[in-house]
């Protein structure tokens, strides 16, 4: 990540809580500097809502992300599949992604895992990484 970058170039699983009354999904996808393929078509939309139920109040939510390299990615919330896409790739239109594009290769098949709180307090517990075999 370069200095003064607003957000890291990433595939982001976004957690959002409800306000007690308004529907608001969690386990969404945000794609700063990246694109994905959904239902066979390249998707350039920055944030895509999942099909999850709203999680109101202070409750623990189980989130799982199944990532098969540059293949499929699935988001699960409380054990339910809520979002699925594939072929994560760098967006050549995004200036912050350009330094990461080597020999025209856009596919993202590796990277780092980060936990981040943007605007509200968040707690994480029992974080684990399990290889897909």
What label would you give each PLM region?
Residues 1-133:
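Carbohydrate-interacting regions of secretory-pathway proteins
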